[in-house]
A protein has these predicted regions:
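Internal, charge-rich low-complexity segments
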Residues: 2-140
Length: 140
């Protein structure tokens, strides 16, 4: 039989601080999206097309859709964001929330857009490509 974990007040405060710092980083990342949404959308769209992960008839249309996604992210509440990223939460060990949300958008919504021919690569490949651009434009 396993040992029952009963945290002391010190352990509880440490766990609470860790959890609140994660939430703070999440809120900071979402708020930074407003400041750099246009160059970020351009960077993500360009990289997705260059790496042949997304085949599209119009790169500008892809960029506009990602820009709309980023603008929507900055206005959503926590529940809606969590609901959108839930299927992809275990994609990588410590996902960046903006990258995860855009990945979910590309995989679930963008596939049905009229200008997108097809989406290639694994979910992880798409996440890593998007995360590379998010880190470039939004260093935390």
């Amino acid at each position: 039989m396993g040992k029952i974990f009963r945290p002391s007040s010190r352990e509880s405060t440490i766990l609470s601080k860790i959890e609140s710092s994660k939430e703070h980083m999440r809120r900071m990342a979402i708020s930074k999206v407003r400041d750099c949404s246009e160059p970020l959308a351009n960077g993500i769209a360009t990289k997705l097309v260059e790496t042949n992960l997304v085949e599209t008839t119009s790169k500008n249309s892809l960029q506009e859709q990602i820009l709309k996604c980023l603008d929507k992210l900055s206005r959503l509440d926590d529940f809606e964001v969590d609901y959108q990223v839930a299927p992809f939460r275990n994609l990588v060990p410590q996902p960046q929330i903006v990258s995860l949300y855009v990945t979910a958008y590309v995989i679930e919504k963008l596939i049905n857009h009229k200008d997108v021919v097809d989406i290639f690569g694994s979910d992880e490949d798409i996440y890593l490509t998007i995360n590379q651009q998010v880190k470039k434009y939004m260093p935390l």
